[in-house]
Amino acid sequence: MEDRIQKAVELFKSGYNCSQSVVAAFADMYGFTQEQALRMSASFGGGIGRMRETCGAACGMFLVAGLETGATEATDREGKAANYALVQELAEEFKKRNGSMICAELLGLKKPEGSSVPEARTEQYYAKRPCAKMVEEAAQIWVEYLEKQMI
């Protein structure tokens, strides 16, 4: 499972957004191709469409949680409740480790950037942003959840 954490970080460092990196690292476990994973998670990067709201890495973790435990019947209240409880547990762990799950807060931004254009991925970009760490944390939290399920 450690290789999945590393894969998520490598995907991010190769240019994929935070959400894509987390989802694509686990997609094959749920029967999705890498292309499908990248497409389904593309909009969540940058705190959802670069709006700096909920961290994209956390969103990716939640998307994978839905693939693992999401209800598939409209009337499955117990299934929905179990999935929501898991998402809340994952969110609490993410916040505990990182102080927040709001992208702008994690980046230390005082106001939204106001652009939909992502920054170029340079050494300076990686040096000033905690995003690779957020991707690693989200993947780590998910791996820890999966490992607990195997016990």
What do these predicted regions represent?
Residues M29-R39, A65-L86, M150:
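Phosphate-handling active-site elements
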Residues N83-I151:
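C-terminal binding/interaction regions
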Residues F12-G15, F26, Y30, I48, ...:
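Structural signal for hydrophobic packing residues in well-ordered secondary-structure cores
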Residues A25-S43, P112-S116:
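Acidic-glycine-rich active-site phosphate/pyrophosphate-binding loop
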Residues Y16, F44-L63:
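Glycine/serine-rich anion-binding loops at beta->alpha junctions
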Residues M1-S14:
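Polybasic, low-complexity association/targeting segments
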Residues R52, E78-G79, F94-K95:
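RNase III-family endoribonuclease catalytic core
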